[in-house]
Design a protein with these regions (language model features):
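Alpha-helical scaffold segments that form or flank carboxylate-/histidine-based iron centers
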Residues: 98-102, 191-205
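Glycine/serine-rich anion-binding loops at beta->alpha junctions
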Residues: 21-22, 90-110, 137-146
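Short, flexible active-site-proximal loops enriched in glycine and acidic residues
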Residues: 68-72, 82-95, 119-143, 173-188
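Long, non-coiled-coil amphipathic alpha-helical linker/lever segments
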Residues: 46-60, 141-197
Length: 220
């Protein structure tokens, strides 16, 4: 069994690792954007969010008659696997890239398409049966997918952020108690003001962070 497969785009043929769920567009992004060490799979909430968007689009396109059921089912199953934490290692593009997220969107399209092809009984790269753009990305653009996925990723990540912020609140409150009797000059309008304690300042920071977290929870 060969260790590569040949995929084609408008720039020509390229060898893609045979075991990769991504395709030629992702391969070119890996070559063009070697900017940071932060890969898409380092942010599982964003990967899951991309799958949610593609999953919803596939079912909507099916209901509207633009995508046949077999293709929609394959896309939906591939997305569900990604939502459950599978195949994340194939989301490999650099988070810092040109094109406002186009490479990220194509990475998701190709992974979902190739996994969908396997579900349908075909080989990876046989896009005549399930295409990354024509099927997985049907009715979408990067400017639809990426902003939506980023917002979903923030929502998915918020419980972990809230836990971390509670740790910060507790630490600030503890410092407030520790320095509760240490006087300092207050500052307002770029000049000295009424004296206060260092502890009061720490407690004010703790209260501010706590209120911001509570306000965010209301909106979520």
């Amino acid at each position: 069994m060969t260790d590569v497969r040949i995929e084609h785009d408008l720039l020509g043929d390229r060898e893609v690792p045979a075991d990769a769920l991504y395709g030629v567009q992702t391969l070119r992004a890996l070559e063009n954007f070697r900017i940071s060490d932060f890969r898409l799979h380092h942010f599982p909430s964003l990967v899951r969010a991309l799958a949610y968007v593609k999953h919803a689009a596939a079912r909507t396109n099916q209901r509207l008659g633009g995508l046949e059921k077999a293709k929609a089912d394959a896309i939906a199953q591939a997305c569900a696997e990604i939502e459950n934490g599978e195949h994340h290692e194939h989301f490999v593009v650099d988070l810092i890239q040109g094109g406002a997220g186009t490479s990220t969107n194509m990475n998701a399209n190709e992974v979902i398409a190739n996994r969908g092809l396997e579900i349908l009984g075909h080989e990876r790269g046989q896009y005549e049966y399930l295409h990354p753009n024509n099927d997985v990305n049907f009715g979408q653009s990067t400017n639809d997918v990426y902003p939506t996925a980023v917002r979903l990723a923030i929502l998915l990540s918020f419980p972990d952020l809230a836990d971390a912020m509670q740790g910060l609140i507790d630490a600030l409150s503890a410092k407030g108690e520790e320095f509760n009797h240490m006087l300092k000059m207050g500052r307002t309008q770029m000049q000295d003001a009424v004296p206060m304690t260092v502890g009061q300042e720490f407690h004010a920071w703790a209260t501010t962070v706590s209120e911001d977290v509570e306000l965010s929870l209301i909106h979520i």
